[in-house]
Amino acid sequence: MIAKTFQGLEEVLAQELTALGANEIEIGRRMVSFSGDKEMMYKANFCLRTAIRILKPIKHFTAKDADEVYEQIKAIRWEDYLDTDKTFAVDAVVFSEEFRHSKFVSYKVKDAIVDYFREKTGERPGVRVNKPDVLLNIHIAETKCTLSLDSSGESLHRRCLLYTSPSPR
């Protein structure tokens, strides 16, 4: 899994993950990767204070252009992740000379998923930018691509954390 964070908080996030019992913790740029089961994913979403999102990678691949991204995404068995009665959205983060516009990448991923379902079922899932049923994230660094399920939904900084101490007067 991948816990995204702000630059400079990677070490703190790694310590939080260690305290939660996560395994195989590796610090990266504005992220910390770790392994764990479904319970760990829920704990990470609920307990981590310095994480922005928890991503569950579903495919790593390389792509030199948008057509390769499309083909790689279309090759995924999407019925394992999404139904035609659900909505989805794609968030793209791109650091590449070839892929300059993240919106274009988002559209290519969306097109591949919609085309997959149309060919298999004759129907398509809906796209909803705000509050989709399934939020996907694609990260591209030059030619290295990672497609992930976003297990957090909204950014974790929007959680309503309740404190037991009285409010200041």
Residue ranges and their predicted role:
Residues I140-L147:
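C-terminal edge-of-domain segments
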Residues Y163-R169:
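Conserved small/polar residues in nucleotide/adenosyl-binding loops
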Residues M1-V134, S151:
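Accessory substrate-recognition/RNA-binding modules or partner subunits associated with SAM-dependent
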Residues H60, H101, H139, H157-C160:
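Histidine (H) residue identity feature
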